[in-house]
Amino acid sequence: YLHEIALLGMRTADLHTSLMRSHEPSFNAQPFSLADRRRLTVRLVASARDAFDRLDARQSALSSDAAADAATLLRRRGAVLDLLQRLDRLSIDVHAIRCHNNYHLGQILRTEHDFVIVDFARPPGMEAPVVLRTGFFRKMLRRLAPPVRPAPDGKGLALVDVATMLRSLSAATATAHHAFLVRRPGEAARIAKWVACWEVWTSAAFLTAYLDRAADPPYLPADERQLRQLLAAFVLDTTLDELRHYVDRRPDRAYIPLSAALSLTRQLD
């Protein structure tokens, strides 16, 4: 299975490189400017504030365990916002490119020996392919796809696609873990360490293969510290966006992004 995840990482790098190398002028990579960085920071901070506000307002709709986790996460609000605001002081040397902008496991079709990436941003009114409108695929998308914002106009940072896929892998793992415990609740302690190990290894396989395949392109920061900071911020942003969605629409499933957000912010205590 790790080989399959690594292949997905390589195909993601191929996607970004292909989008950057298009002969269409509108696909040319462009430097990520100081103004771009400031707009990014403002958006991330505003989105995080909104997620915390909604979580605070909807705690009563959560289960007792989820409400306790929510209270813990809310105590980290200030530290999370400080972390995101630091991006404005980060001198990012990277180029923006056309990206998928809605990238998760629900957008991946498995062929016999490879993957096909589908459902790029479409013009208004254009429907998805028929196969993706069938009941099976609609159900798959609901289960595997964390909600994302509409694709922004213009170009963005490729690491956003990487972050949303990493979050999707995490959400799929958490969903399978929960389904297992419903059937075998007595094995919670035994299985927890294996679930954590599985998530770490799948994420590492995807990210390592992606970075190796991309091979220092202009759409990734050459500085490893910058790359780590940006990716961590985007994964956290995606997780909080997912949390906001579930708190509003599916509070019974809010435990999935809540648990992930707690894990991502644990070092901030």
Where do the language-model regions lie?
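Alpha-helix capping/termination and helix-coil
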Residues: 23, 91, 112, 166-180, ...
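Conserved catalytic-loop position in the HRD/HxD motif
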Residues: 102, 107
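Substrate-binding beta-hairpin/strand module that engages nucleic acids
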Residues: 170-201
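Conserved active-site beta-strand element of glycosyltransferases/polysaccharide synthases
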Residues: 117
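ATP-dependent phospho-/nucleotidyl transfer catalytic cores
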Residues: 1-100, 111-113, 124-155, 159, ...
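Alpha-helical D-x4-[hydrophobic]G micro-motif in the C-lobe of protein kinase domains
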Residues: 161-165
